[in-house]
Amino acid sequence: MTPPPRTRARRLAAPLTAGVLTVGALTALPAPQAHAAGSVVKVTGAQGDWQLTVDGKPYQIKGLTWGPSIADADRYMPDLKSMGVNTIRTWGTDASSKPLFDSAAAHGVKVIAGFWLQPGGGPGSGGCVNYRTDTAYKNQMLDEFPKWVQTYKDNPGVLMWDVGNESVLGLQNCYGGAELERQRDAYTSFVNDVAKRIHAVDPGHPVTSTDAWVGAWPYFKKNAPDLDLYAVNSYNAVCDVRSAWEKGGYTKPYIITETGPAGEWEVPDDANGVPLEPGDRAKADGYTRAWGCVTGHRGVALGATMFHYGTEYDFGGIWFNLLPAGQKRLSYYAVKRAYGGDTSHDNTPPAVSDFTVEGDAGRVQAGRDLTLAVRATDPDGDALSYEVLDNSMYIDKGKDLTPLPLTDLGGGRLRVTAPDRPGVWKVYVKVTDGHGNVGVETRSVRVVPPTPSGTNLALGRPATASSYQPGYGDCPCPTANAVDGNQNTRWASDWSDPQWLQVDLGARTAFRHVQLVWEASYAKAYTVRTSDDGQNWRTVRTVTDGNGGVDDFDVTGTGRYVRVNGTARGTGYGYSLYEFGVYG
């Protein structure tokens, strides 16, 4: 059996077109169609020579997964149609789906309508159902899904039904060993039960089930004979699907329900130890390559819905979306060309041919100047505008991109201020042409605390605190961690105000600089104090607008003891410091 792919996080926040159904949910069905108007869709032909037909006519799926709000369907359907797209795919179907089906039908587009089953394909995608014993959940889905099929089967926007998404893979996040095998058998058997129920209600549309790798297909072959065809999400390995199908002895055709450029889980790490994101040109080529491999398996691969017609301008959106914030990328035009759309009169995006970080991208000092060198050209000669953004995914799983104030130094050189929080950040350059097109490239930088001049008087000295965390998460987090010179260890306090940490310098000593390297649990308000006897304190610095990261400032102080005294936490947790440096 083909081994499962490297464990991956969800590519985007699950872009369900309709809400995920849960046990006990009460949902009102929209009014049924006034009359039967749906197409009859069939998988026809014989072994190795299949085709999909709609009302008796051959139909090759030229599709994209759907990302925008259903309310925007009429806005985006004409654009999809102009790309040569004839199909979109969703992950969920419920009462909210009707406007999408109606809009699709009105524009000559059909929908692969999904039904979501837990656990889905990645951590956080859904709960861990026991498909061997949880009859309540299974009965709920067996009741709910056919209701929506009955409601929408005559809608001309429906192409087929797709039961589940990546759950054969996703079950590995819930079970292991022999129990995992039993659960996978039980899940695929349940999918077959759903397929039979759907066929009983709607014999006019095929039923499939999507998973994340071809290693799921033996389970479907064994346990789900009532599926009309298979479906798989495959990115960098999409050109290997044909070989897996041929070696597996399968007797059903398949479709690719997600594909595109190499995903985060498939690429090597860069010099900073995070996934090396392909550039815009490589991503565009990934879609072209994927479509070539789909169409190359004639009579078996019946088409694809490539990933992703989405508009999010966040970490996952930059990796995969064809039009983040409605701006079209090279990938958008690659898909349009693949599907036969007319690009002869299109104004196309700027191309970023080079993007580098000046200096050492592995040691960028927090809060200091960061200079980027960008080389971009526009095929239409348009004037270009630049924007720089950053993202903290590899620090705290943040998805948002934050625009940074920049200074254009000329000659493609842009200066911004580096983030003030240590860790590996993604830095993006966005180049727009004023005609709705964008080029985006990204690099990683490892942000480190600035190196103060002088000697760290606190390094290795005795430290005490009002409290510390003896055991939570990665703790124990004792006071000594804050003065050990190691940015990977931390002191953490109780979850209350006030809290303090102090270091004993051994003798009355003059110091001129303090550096605090905060973990995510930072101080919003605090003071730095000094004392000769540990009893009587003098304040040398007051901060009321702390935002975490690295606080690096000059002071004028003398004393044996130096204390940071937190009075207002920035989070619901305690105070946590990687390092407390006192410099003379």
Language-model features: locations:
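Secretory targeting and sorting signals
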Residues: M1-A36
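Disordered, acidic Ser/Thr/Pro-rich linker "stalks" and the adjacent N-terminal cap
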Residues: P450-G506, V517-Y522, T542-G546, G572, ...
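Extracellular glycoside hydrolase catalytic/binding regions
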Residues: Q183-G296, N321
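Short beta-strand-plus-loop segments that form exposed binding edges in beta-rich domains
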Residues: N565-G572
